[in-house]
From Swiss-Prot:
InterPro entries: Actin (IPR004000), Actin/actin-like_CS (IPR020902), Actin_CS (IPR004001), ATPase_NBD (IPR043129). Its EC number is 3.6.4.-. This is Actin-2. Keywords: ATP-binding, Cytoplasm, Cytoskeleton, Hydrolase, Nucleotide-binding. It comes from Oryza sativa subsp. japonica (Rice). Belongs to the actin family.
Amino acid sequence: MADAEDIQPLVCDNGTGMVKAGFAGDDAPRAVFPSIVGRPRHTGVMVGMGQKDAYVGDEAQSKRGILTLKYPIEHGIVSNWDDMEKIWHHTFYNELRVAPEEHPILLTEAPLNPKANREKMTQIMFETFSVPAMYVAIQAVLSLYASGRTTGIVLDSGDGVSHTVPIYEGYALPHAILRLDLAGRDLTDSLMKILTERGYSFTTSAEREIVRDIKEKLAYVALDYEQELETAKSSSSVEKSYELPDGQVITIGAERFRCPEVMFQPSLIGMEAPGIHETTYNSIMKCDVDIRKDLYGNIVLSGGSTMFPGIADRMSKEITALAPSSMKIKVVAPPERKYSVWIGGSILASLSTFQQMWISRAEYEESGPAIVHRKCF
């Protein structure tokens, strides 16, 4: 009998901003690295430096000063398959150090992912990486699994896209899924703009990463935006300083909550779209009247862009204002929500009942990539 680790399924959550990968049954991903592929902007002049024509993940991040960084996943959906293949190759061989042909693999996808994309994903796994079996699961559904529920509405907001996905007894309700093309990357861009207005210049793809760090460390969601703006004007209680890589120290005040406020008021960056609270409410209203109560009572936050302090309280306040007055509203923000999609995948792939759900190599060879629509829903 082969060692259990040999046949342990792999779980790979490919986000717009970060790849989370590891082994089914683990309680956290082993590898978390940026979904970026970097190519040198200059020609190498030093022989024997071992320069590569492309760098992936952390290595691309650390050499960002001399590279052009590209994200192969935009708004949660793969747009550049060659680069995506590089990322998967890096995941298996360099990060997890496994042979993909020996492990079943569970991949994740954005809700409302185009059919052609799922097929392409399936094809690459079987043909390029020769996996023995694979499955594609919807990200938000996995987050709900991770929270120990089978019914609820998930607001999943990552780097590239936000979704509200109502799930009843384990089934996503596709007619009520809403997508909002506003997420972490837009918040970073908006913060870059705000800081530029204040005279700091952040323009390159490398400098954007600095701003992302400022956002992750210092931003928070105000319970009452207007009131918070008044407080920021009259006192320095919200000011914090941040040291840039070159030693320069910048002070940021109202920007700390102006940046994530965009999620509740997309009009702040000129987007004509409802905020995350309204999107969640609209999703619930598209569901059958009999299940709304269960959804209002199980609003689950998931993804890196729900990590801002204060977001759950604000969400609760905003939805309470929209919902019927007698409705009991509960917003759940699990502490591990940054990785809850991955954790849900880890749980799912290790269930004994899941083992008949895998798409096997034989099934793929018989039916081709379209098999994914029949087996994964």
